[in-house]
UniProtKB/Swiss-Prot annotation:
It holds the Pfam family PMSR. PANTHER family: MITOCHONDRIAL PEPTIDE METHIONINE SULFOXIDE REDUCTASE (PTHR42799:SF2). GO terms for biological process: cellular response to oxidative stress; protein modification process. It comes from Cronobacter sakazakii (strain ATCC BAA-894) (Enterobacter sakazakii). The gene is msrA. Belongs to the MsrA Met sulfoxide reductase family. The active site is at C52. GO terms for cellular component: cytoplasm. Its EC number is 1.8.4.11. One of its GO terms (molecular function) is peptide-methionine (S)-S-oxide reductase activity. The keyword Oxidoreductase applies. Has an important function as a repair enzyme for proteins that have been inactivated by oxidation. Catalyzes the reversible oxidation-reduction of methionine sulfoxide in proteins to methionine. This is Peptide methionine sulfoxide reductase MsrA. Keywords: Oxidoreductase.
Length: 212
């Protein structure tokens, strides 16, 4: 694969080898004060990719019912990748956010609404000015119920786009979750640590219709 061909997905055989050593993870979330790794009893996990993970993580940590969030990499092949490796396009991973949430306070359906309404799901291997396979739109369900909800929400959002006169093809990947690798600490809660930092995500002005 050409070094500059960042919009072309690689194969597993082409992926960088990675490493066995996991990325160090801070014990506590800078904003919520909760564990960055534990999932308390009764809580659930969701994985979303919708462009640069700095802005995406901030979207989700601000929601009532969200226990913690983490920026990381998933959907590809390279184990325990670095940010530089992911940005090379040679890991197959997307920049993603892991959301731990209380389903008694906020539903997976409500998380899907935030997902669809806050980025452009029809841009292929980019999001705005951020170009590369790592910026693709993706939902990585962890359960059959999440997968069914994700697929149904895609169909509803497609219909809403068409009703608004937008007939572009939705390129959002919906695939069973692969291992999630935490990003380096400097990327965790980045826009809390750097309030004036870059945030390149934004919606297209279309709302996700509610379930029938």
């Amino acid at each position: 694969m050409s070094f500059f061909d960042k919009k072309q997905m690689i194969t597993e055989e082409e992926a960088l080898p990675g490493r066995n050593t996991r990325m160090p993870v801070a014990a506590l979330h800078t904003v919520t004060g909760h564990s960055m790794t534990n999932v308390p009893e009764g809580m659930e996990v969701a994985l979303f990719a919708m462009g640069c993970f700095w802005g995406v993580e901030r979207l989700f940590w601000a929601l009532p019912g969200v226990y913690s969030t983490a920026a990381g990499y998933t959907g590809g092949y390279t184990p325990n990748p670095t940010y530089r490796e992911v940005c090379s396009g040679q890991t197959g991973h997307a920049e993603a956010v892991r959301v731990v949430y209380d389903p008694n306070v906020i539903s997976y359906e409500q998380l899907l609404q935030v997902f669809w309404e806050n980025h452009d799901p029809a841009q292929g291997m980019r999001q705005g000015n951020d170009v590369g396979t790592q910026y693709r739109s993706a939902i990585y369900p962890l359960t059959p119920e999440q997968e069914a909800a994700a697929q149904a929400s895609l169909e509803r959002f497609r219909a809403a786009m068409e009703a608004a006169g937008d007939y572009r093809h939705i390129t959002t990947e919906i695939a069973p979750a692969k291992p999630f690798y935490y990003a380096e600490d400097e990327h965790q809660q980045y826009l809390h640590k750097n309030p004036y930092g870059y945030c390149g995500i934004g919606g297209i002005g279309v709302c996700l219709p509610p379930e029938a």
